[in-house]
Amino acid sequence: MVQQAVVGSGITNERVIAAMAATPRHEFVPANLRNKAYLDMSLPIGDQQTISAPFIVSFMTEALDPQSTDKVLEIGTGSGYQAAVLSPLVQQVFTIEIVESLGNRARATLKRLKYDNVLARVGDGFKGWPRHAPFDKIIVTCSPERVPQPLVDQLREGGLMVIPVGERYQQTMYVLRKKNGKMQAEALRPTLFVPMTGNAEDNRQVKPDPLKPALFNGDFELTKEDYPFV
């Protein structure tokens, strides 16, 4: 998987490559999909959410430029896989999941696999985690329509945020750098992530399209008919 999906796709950061190779992705997917765990594809993990494809995880991780002294906030724990990849690369990971069942499951998995520098909780990621701010880096694995101001406020001066931003069905991955209190944006690539819910969804101007009910989680290839348990 690593040679094809990560190195073969242009990832060059040796620490990121090593972390991807060392992280057991099969531990973060449903048992009935473990035979697909090392394919470069997103997979459903329940509750209308997905685990991102390995290339996307490695791409976002490399864009984050993780350093061993970094305190990182992740928004959208999901299965816990992204937090697990970050764990050996940074000092500490704080991760928030809004879906209670997913958050509890991810926390149990991370604890069982002894990712001891990862602290997970259930909550609305739009609001960040003020108690542990400021953060050196923030990585967002769900898509808001606009960058949440609480996350900007909780990023330290000189810090970096990787985030997909846009409408529900069309987004762009950005890396944002905080300079003099303002965010400088660099567009990285088009992308498609599950939408950020909670406060972000309540304030979304472009609402779900009732004519496309199968497009329920931001992934065009997944429908409830394909995966009835999601």
Which positions does each model-derived feature cover?
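Extracellular and organelle-lumenal recognition/adhesion modules and their flexible linkers in secreted
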Residues: 205-230
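Extracytoplasmic/secreted proteins and extracellular or luminal domains
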Residues: 131, 169, 181, 212-213
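Short, solvent-exposed loop/turn elements at domain surfaces
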Residues: 28-30, 196-197, 224-230
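Conserved nucleotide-cofactor-binding alpha/beta core module
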Residues: 65-174
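Conserved class I S-adenosyl-L-methionine
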Residues: 165-192
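Extracellular beta-propeller repeat domains
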Residues: 163-165, 169, 195, 200-205
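Class I SAM-dependent transferase core
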Residues: 1-73, 77, 85, 89, ...
